[in-house]
Amino acid sequence: MLTFNSFNLAILISNFFWPLVRILAFFSTAPIFNDQNVNKKVKIILSFLIAFLIKPFLPKVNVELFSIIGLFLLFQQILIGIALGLTCQFLFAAFTLSGEIIALQIGLSFANFFNSNRYIGTSLISRWLNILNLLFFLTLNVHLYLVFMLIDSFYKIPVDVNFLSANIFFIFLKFSSNIFLNGVMFALPIMIFFLISTLIMSILNRLSPQISIFSIGFPLNLLIGILILYYLMSMSFPFFKSLVNQLISFIFYTFLKI
């Protein structure tokens, strides 16, 4: 005869609840999904749907939800979801850094937009690069890759496996430094040009005091900076694809094998 008691019910609920927590934590930090314009009800319904579909294929965890081990697993699922989402945010952070550097060099750092997601002001160039980044993100279906990686994480890092280790922080630090290095490299042509331009204008100003840096240098820097930025646009899509490949390689071959 089939017996079903409160312990079995608690195990059944917990096996659905822990994947749901990881998915919700991921959607709260991952790009596109954490946007203020995405309805919270849509994110919750999508999380419940994914958790319901993958639950029959996940290994059973015989741990009660309201126990010390259960609370530890709950904290661990939140940590894994947030870590996956924040790792994906590096794609947009690299372009944001490039835009801030370019805007500072051109002289457009004073032109700011309010970012409703981060509650801070971002420069005009950063906003423009982020819009391009968003278009590339959707064109390449990266959001679907992220959902696939999230589902795959339940097989590579099961719910009852200890995820916490001393190497996690250093692994993320190394990867984030590599992503931000790429962001600086994207803005490097403009940085080098304006370094040379400032040096030349300084020498000309010393040789001929009639040449004013403020009346000639700033408009010239703005004009040439926009022309170089137009040239960089042809490189932005290959640059984004390179970042996506680095992100996918890191998640599949490093993060999910910790």
Swiss-Prot record:
What does the record give as the organism's lineage? Bacteria, Pseudomonadati, Pseudomonadota, Gammaproteobacteria, Enterobacterales
Q: Where are the transmembrane segments?
A: 7-29, 44-58, 65-87, 91-113, 129-151, 182-204, 211-233
Task: Give a GO biological-process term.
Answer: bacterial-type flagellum assembly
**Family, per the entry?**
Belongs to the FliR/MopE/SpaR family.
Query: Keywords for this entry?
Result: Bacterial flagellum, Cell membrane, Membrane, Transmembrane, Transmembrane helix
Query: By what name is this protein known?
Result: Flagellar biosynthetic protein FliR
Q: A single Pfam family, by name? A: Bac_export_1
Write down the InterPro entries for this protein, in alphabetical order.
FliR (IPR006303), T3SS_IM_R (IPR002010)
Q: Where in the cell is it found?
A: Cell membrane; Bacterial flagellum basal body
Q: How does it sit in the membrane?
A: Multi-pass membrane protein
GO cellular component annotations, sorted alphabetically?
Answer: bacterial-type flagellum basal body; plasma membrane
Per its database record, what is this protein's job? Role in flagellar biosynthesis.
